[in-house]
Each structure stands twice: as structure tokens, then as C-alpha cells.
Amino acid sequence: MLKVVQSWDDGVVEDARLAELLRGYRARATFNLNPGLHRRQRSFGWRCGDQEVWRLGWDELREVYAGFEIANHSLNHPNLTELAPLDLERELRDSRRLLQDWFQQPIRGFCYPFGGFNPAVKAAVRAAGHDYARTVTEVEAVFPPADALELGVSCRFSDPAFWSRYQCARDKGGVFLFWGHSYELRSAALWADLEAKIAHITADPAAEWASLEALLAVQEQSDA
């Protein structure tokens, strides 16, 4: 049985629409958040080309992400490889604490901002209490990872090779992990394409939605 995992970054306003879409198909997902960048109300984040990207407000996070897995994406989304040790520790520990307090759930996962990491960053991620860390490195075999702090991905949600990589993972009965940012869904056609993918996967009798935490828990039990 193919396990399908999806991972979405940055806590932007389009996540509200995305979460509702996923609920309609009972699709599991992980959302990676930066608690230091959210304000009480929705706030401007940055410009992506001619598009303004806005972040969700703190007051709506619990409702938007109810039922989904939450992972840490650092406090303020810096390149962690450029930080001094004390700043690195703050980015990792303070963000995890804030997310756990707000969502009232353990935060086991991490996602490297900009995909940047090195041995010192990995060690700090582990020391801050995380059990896994997702990268943006594309790999053929996602799971089980050789190193849970260097968890690779299959592809982005918008990758032209999405279905060929899905089929390859399906043939092997492995794990297919796709990722992205919902602000990249800039048109009705892109939203329709994503929904078609979610619907197809949900209807596939040889596939099921999974979460990284659940997969790691199974692996830990088998290794015990």
C-alpha cells in the first residue's frame, strides 16, 4: 500500500482554502509554521513577483489547521546556517514552545527554512526536541530515511513529473511525499489541478493518506 504524505509551508492565508479542500477528501497533511511571524490578525508577509503574500492571524490558526499535523518551521524563517549558536537555539526552541502552547499538541517535526541545514543545524534541531526534519531534497526512496533529520521529498505538488514519480512510488509500495506553498496556487486552473490530484489519490485503492509522525511512530516500534 502506497503511503502518501503532503507538507505545506509558511502559514499563508491560502492555507485556509487548502485545508477546507483537503478536509473534503479526508486527506491528511502537515503544515509547517513560523510562530514569530504571525500577528493577531492577518498581516502582509512579502511579495512574490506581482503577488502579495499574506499570513494568517493567530486567532484563526487553530480553526484553520484543526485536525492536521503541525510542524515547526522556525520562529522567523531565517537561513539557519547563517545564525550564531544562541540565535539558532532561540529560533528552534522558542518556536516549538509557542506552537505547542497554542495548539496544545506535541510538535515532533521540523522543516528547514529555505531548505538550509548543516551538521550544526541538525544537532540543534534534535536538541530542541524534534524527531524529524524535512528538507527540499528530492530522493527516489523517501522512507525510511537514512537520517530522520534529512528527510527527503518526492517532488513539489506542481512538478510536471508528479504522476510519474507517484506511479514509481506506487509500484514499489513505498512513500510518496509532495510539498509546496499554497500561495503558489495563483489561478483557478492551478486549484482545479491540485484538487484533481487529491481526488485521484483519495480514490486510488492502492494508496492511503499518511502523516510523517505516524510513519515514524511505526518505524520506531519496528526498531524497538
Give residue ranges: language-model regions.
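Glycan-processing catalytic domains of CAZymes
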Residues: 6-7, 72, 132, 144, ...
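Metal-dependent polysaccharide deacetylase catalytic core of the NodB/CE4 family, i.e.
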Residues: 25-121, 126-131, 139, 144-150, ...
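A short acidic, amphipathic alpha-helical/loop segment
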Residues: 17-21, 120-124, 165, 193, ...
